[in-house]
């Protein structure tokens, strides 16, 4: 374990402040191993749930964590700055959810050269440097969303996708998993060109309204993460168009409310608390010199939920508010 000087701690605090100026951050824990977690976001309820899981596990393990993420899930440069600052603080391990699967590669090389183990989460990277990736099987989850969409609209009609990005592996997999299932299993469904809203609710709502205006006969719209799905719901509501089936991804209070009210048909929920827990568990294993024993991926699971099962205790346990 690394020994820190007073000067290093002061420098770390200053750097953390600089990162906070363009996003949000928090810290928790005591004097144990230091784990710096750089997320894809901070404000969405999903990321707050990941943070909660990481904090809970850090308390169990006697570790100390910092958790930060950019204000928007399109702020790749801000996230790179945060990762740079995290490496400068020389933590015992880093948890990283990449907004761009390629942009962080040089920094991951730097972390490796400084013997800082990296644990990827939510989105992997185009690198073998992370010892493991704790994440949902996003392709399988998106395929499940596609299956439910096809069933809900009777296997025919136009369907649109509003995806959070085309640079992170989660964005790519949630797009491709949905499209591939539809192409293989639903020949009667016409997929419209994919639109990208950056996970931003307002932008995704505007995109949705444009889709509806250009395709008044549209049957369904899929939103690939919390911000995208809520944006789709708002866009459908603001358009005044009835009869559009909305399928989302993630949960959060706004999506839960939309499903309970019938505006959204259903969604895939991940297990963000478990993701946070697994990041810290894996980091601690790496700090203890057992990183080579970690599996390549840690599948944290997913569930379909709708009005019929939303009150099931198993579903309630993985919904975040």
Language-model region placement:
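Hinge/cleft segment of the Venus flytrap/periplasmic-binding protein
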Residues: 11, 31, 169-170, 181-188, ...
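Short, low-complexity disordered leader/linker segments with a strong preference
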Residues: 1-34, 59, 109-116, 321
């Amino acid at each position: 374990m690394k020994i820190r000087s007073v000067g290093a701690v002061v420098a770390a605090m200053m750097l953390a402040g600089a990162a906070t100026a363009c996003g949000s951050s928090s810290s928790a824990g005591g004097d144990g191993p230091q784990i710096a977690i750089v997320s894809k976001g901070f404000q969405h309820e999903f990321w707050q749930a990941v943070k909660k899981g990481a904090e809970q596990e850090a308390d169990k393990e006697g570790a100390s964590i910092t958790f930060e993420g950019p204000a928007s899930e399109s702020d790749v440069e801000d996230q790179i700055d945060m990762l740079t600052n995290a490496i400068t603080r020389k933590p015992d391990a880093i948890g990283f959810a990449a907004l761009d699967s390629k942009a962080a590669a040089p920094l991951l090389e730097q972390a490796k050269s400084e013997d800082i183990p990296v644990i990827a989460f939510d989105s992997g990277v185009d690198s073998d440097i992370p010892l493991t990736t704790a994440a949902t099987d996003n392709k399988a989850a998106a395929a499940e969303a596609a299956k439910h969409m096809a069933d809900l609209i009777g296997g025919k009609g136009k369907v649109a996708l509003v995806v959070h990005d085309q640079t992170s592996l989660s964005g790519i997999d949630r797009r491709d998993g949905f499209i591939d299932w539809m192409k293989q299993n639903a020949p009667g469904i016409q997929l419209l060109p994919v639109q990208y809203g950056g996970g931003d609710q307002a932008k995704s709502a505007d995109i949705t309204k444009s889709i509806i205006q250009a395709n008044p006969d549209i049957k369904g719209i899929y939103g690939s993460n919390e911000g995208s799905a809520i944006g789709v719901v708002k866009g459908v509501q603001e358009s005044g168009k009835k009869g559009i089936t909305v399928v989302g991804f993630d949960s959060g209070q706004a999506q839960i409310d939309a499903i309970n009210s019938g505006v959204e048909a259903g969604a895939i929920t991940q297990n963000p608390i478990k993701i946070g827990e697994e990041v810290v568990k894996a980091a601690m294993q790496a700090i203890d010199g057992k990183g080579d024993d970690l599996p390549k991926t840690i599948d944290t699971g997913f569930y379909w939920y709708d009005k019929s099962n939303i009150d099931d205790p198993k579903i309630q346990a993985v919904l975040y508010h």
